[in-house]
Amino acid sequence: ICQASTTLYGGAIRAGMTIIERNNHTIASTYVPRGLDAMVSYGDSDLKFRNDLGFPVTIKTYTVGNTLYVEFYGQDPGWFDFIEPVSWASGHSAWAQRKYYKNGSVIRTENLPSSYYYN
């Protein structure tokens, strides 16, 4: 289930969604850089995000073989071309940001929730 929540989190980051709640795994995942995972646990931890872009967004999920895809569809917001998530780690801690680009230049950098891992 956590690979699905991590994939959805990555899509939400890249689509410009406002992250409301996100929890990392206690042990760092091998399938995503530290700081970019999302763990869910029924009754305890959840992944929540909100669309503040000012227009509706449709989320499409599907699988091809063993690969899960999450796609966000909506209007072009106009003020950015794409979003790149970046992360870095030191010891047990990890930090992440998303960088908004317009015409090849970073126009905005936003901190994402930090993480702490036991490994």
Name what the model sees in each region.
Residues I1-N119:
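Well-ordered beta-sheet/strand-loop patches within structured domains
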